[in-house]
């Protein structure tokens, strides 16, 4: 009797730890994806579609039918280029609407973290501005 109670408590704690680890993993994953999109944006010519594809597929021109990393799609990525051609030229890459499912049956449902964004100054990549 006591061992079944302890086993249930252990399983609840274990699944809770796994869910927390999953949240941390996806937080880091999305943070790194927007960072890589911002890095791509500052060293290449500005192309919002290519930047969104780098974030979602890790490739500026993915093959047709390619699925995004962990369900991420280019439509979840927004790219903003502000103050173009000035010293305060910035690129903002943002991911919104990403949905993840919990492992735990008690937290069944969809969790939408974020939004995640990264802003980077455009350096010009050696081009005259």
Feature-to-residue mapping (PLM):
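Alpha-helical assembly-interface signal, strongest on the long, hydrophobic N-terminal helix that forms
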Residues: 1-57
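Short, conserved structural patches
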Residues: 35-129
């Amino acid at each position: 009797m006591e061992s079944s109670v302890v086993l249930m408590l252990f399983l609840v704690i274990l699944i809770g730890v796994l869910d927390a680890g999953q949240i941390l993993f996806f937080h880091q994953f999305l943070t790194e994806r927007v960072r890589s999109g911002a890095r791509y944006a500052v060293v290449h010519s500005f192309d919002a579609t290519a930047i969104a594809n780098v974030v979602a597929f890790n490739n500026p021109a993915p093959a047709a039918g390619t699925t995004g990393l962990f369900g991420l799609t280019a439509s979840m990525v927004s790219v903003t280029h502000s103050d173009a051609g000035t010293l305060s030229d910035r690129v903002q890459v943002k991911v919104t609407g990403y949905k993840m499912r919990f492992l735990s049956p008690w937290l069944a449902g969809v969790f939408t973290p974020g939004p995640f964004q990264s802003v980077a100054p455009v350096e010009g990549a050696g081009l005259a501005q």
